[in-house]
Structures are given as structure tokens and as C-alpha cells.
Amino acid sequence: MKNDQKYDIKVQVRTTYLQDQSDPAQEQYVFAYTITINNIGSVASQLVSRHWIITGGDGETREVRGLGVVGEQPLLKPGESFEYTSGTAISSIAGSMKGSYQMVAEDGFHFSVEIPEFILSVPRVLH
């Protein structure tokens, strides 16, 4: 088995615009994102840290780094998944996020998992 199959983590993202927490008059648009992390590899691996790049539609970019996710550093055995919901605010009606998780496998191998870019967008309202 190749290493990339041995250490194989899949990331899926769903987003929701939080209208009740947003304040367009103050250019604050709040979004929730739910992430599902699946270990489809053959070795248990622990998520130890995260790195986000958050970009607003105006081109403003900020980076966020930290240990774990939502206060946890989940250990995922082969076939297991972990899901969490978090949020962010941007100053425009659309933007994006992307990043990576830093993982450590039970055999001590350190690797990075890409979080594919996803869109944050206020839904259009039809009158």
C-alpha cells in the first residue's frame, strides 16, 4: 500500500449564512461551516492543528492558526469520521475559506490534509 493511501483523510464542507447574526449595515456577514473529516486510510491519525485562510470578496485576507478544532484534537481510527460546526465573519456578501489540518498518525508520521476552498455567500433574495 502506498503512503498516500495509508494516510488518507477526506474533508467535506457545508456552509450556512447566519442572517440573524449578521449586520449588513455594519458590513458584517456571519457564516457557519460544518466539516466532516473521514479517515479513509489504514492508520489511525490525530488532528493536532489547523490553518485557515479566509478571504472576503473585497480581497481582504486573514489567517487563523490553532490547536485542534472546536477545543478537540480528535483521533480518527480507519473508517471513523469526526464532524464539527464553527463559524466566521467577513465584511462582504461573498468570500471563501481554505486551509489545512496537521495530522499525526499512530506510527508517528506527520502529514498535512488540504481543506479544499469553499465559498461563503449570502443567498440571493427574490422579491
From Swiss-Prot:
Pfam families: DUF525
Family annotation (SUPFAM superfamilies): ApaG-like
InterPro entries: ApaG-like, ApaG_domain, ApaG_sf, Uncharacterised_ApaG
Cross-referenced Gene3D superfamilies: ApaG domain
Extent of the signal sequence: none
Sequence intervals crossing the membrane: none
Domain ApaG intervals: 3-127
NCBIfam families reported in the protein's UniProt record: PRK05461.1 (NF003967)
Protein name as annotated: Protein ApaG
